[in-house]
Amino acid sequence: VYKNWYDQEIPTHMVKHIDKKIVLWQAMISQKQQRELDSLFKTEEDLHILIMNVEALSTQKGVDFAKKFLFSHRALMAVDESTTIKNPDAKRTKSICDLGLASRYNRILTGSPVTKSPLDLYKQCEFLQPELLGFSSYYAFRARFAKLKTMNYGGKSFQLVTGYKNLDELAEIIKPFSERILKKECLDLPPKTYIKRTIQLSTEQQKLYTQMKRMAIAELHGKTMTTATALVQLMRLQQITCGHFKADDGSVKQIKNNRISELLSVLDEVEGKAIIWCHWRHDIQNVVAAITKEYGPRSVVTYYG
């Protein structure tokens, strides 16, 4: 999503007469990338735009740079797909809300601010402005708008959300500072809009990919992968980008990658059922394991040959 702002949205929609400098944050910072990042702190008349993915704000390096940028500019901070900061306990959510205090203006954008629960609104609104909803804590907000039942498990008690209440009141609270625009009202769009999500390779993937691309051979944990033809080489490169490494002896090694975490983010944003297409059987196994862990054993079924 964030790379789409760099490639398409800002170049297309920002007026041409504004001089601007746009820098895209990258997990792997080269010397060229570092020079681009440093240029954001030069004193000049250009509008400075920093584009970061939310995953970067789960890292201290990303948070520190964003904080430096915000403290150096009279900034507007916008979070696209803002349901990514709905979880009040997530480290990323806390980091982004803290960063919001350093910006002059805050905005959120999302297709649906409530994906599964009205309680999703609290942290998104807190980013806009603390206590914007009129509650000083998430738990006070939850007590007002959720039906709670005290449950006991393993000798501990906890509050289970069984339903929701006072939703008309909540709708009135958010009305003054929210704006809903339907697709048909703003753009002449096709019936379906396809969104491409660009996922960065992990350090391990990048190393193996480079080895395979240059020398048609790669090595991981003592296992070797070689190719005899260009077609097989392309297939091996695709396996590496998918997050696994099939050695010459037939064994499969998992490679650290960002695909599953991005998939779970997508699932968190959609309502109802979803169809997930995979290229390799090993991918299917990884997807099933991740969804089962997140949503339970009866949340996913497979169909493949």
PLM segments and residue spans:
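Conserved helicase ATPase motor motifs in RecA-like P-loop NTPase domains
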Residues: 104-118
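Conserved motor-coupling elements within RecA-like helicase/translocase cores
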Residues: 32-50
